[in-house]
From Swiss-Prot:
Bilayer disposition of the protein: Peripheral membrane protein
Primary gene name: chmp1b
Organism of origin: Xenopus tropicalis
Chain segments carrying region Disordered: 167-199
Record field: compositional bias (Polar residues): 170-183
InterPro entries: Snf7_fam
Name by which UniProt lists this protein: Charged multivesicular body protein 1b
Length: 199
């Protein structure tokens, strides 16, 4: 097995590993959602909010892993084509030297930078390339939008058949431009609450 074939194998393996990490995040998101329901049932709105933030963070992280998995997979396909056509250049071979440790680290920013180098090599070979995303550092965020948290809390409360009484200051506006969807969601939640009171 040539070093390029070995690196091709590593790329494919990394894509699968990233996909596996996305699945783990999905599982964690479901666990956090179950905890939201329990906290709401006990009337612990603050605890429910923490679990909602965790759930959204896991969801976003999972999406990032999926995106990077697809990107690595696409690069692997291009490497496969280059190997098959015998178009592996010296500069491309140079890029793969740091690949092993980068892929094993599962660090999205480092993998993204490595994919950038690969994609640059393919552009110079006139192999058509399409970047799926900019570096993942822009999308990996530690903060969670409050309207997403509020919507998830309401969604979980509705699924659990409970009324969520959140003390929100009057006239409080959400983060820049509250969406029509969240307003509609609030109206639906209020209607559901009224229907429950009538029963």
């Amino acid at each position: 097995m040539s070093s390029m074939e070995k690196n091709l194998f590593n790329l494919k393996f990394a894509a699968k590993e990233l996909h596996r990490n996305a699945k783990k995040c999905e599982k964690e998101e479901k666990t956090e959602k179950a905890k939201i329901k329990k906290a709401i049932q006990k009337g612990n709105t603050e605890i429910a909010r923490i679990h909602a933030e965790n759930a959204i963070r896991q969801k976003n992280q999972g999406i990032n892993f999926l995106r990077m998995s697809a990107r690595v997979d696409a690069v692997a396909a291009r490497v496969q084509t280059a190997v098959t056509m015998g178009k592996v250049t010296k500069s491309m071979a140079g890029v793969v030297k740091s690949m092993d440790t980068t892929l094993k680290s599962m660090n999205l920013e480092k993998i993204s930078a490595l994919m950038d180098k690969f994609e640059h090599q393919f552009e110079t070979l006139d192999v058509q390339t399409q970047q799926m995303e900019d570096t993942m550092s822009n999308t990996t965020t530690l903060t969670t939008p409050q309207n997403q948290v509020d919507n998830l809390l309401h969604e979980m409360a509705d699924e659990a058949g409970l009324d969520l009484n959140m003390e929100l200051p009057q006239g409080q506006t959400g983060s820049v431009g509250t969406s029509v969807a969240s307003t509609e969601q609030d109206e639906l939640s209020q209607r559901l609450a009224r229907l429950r009171d009538q029963v």
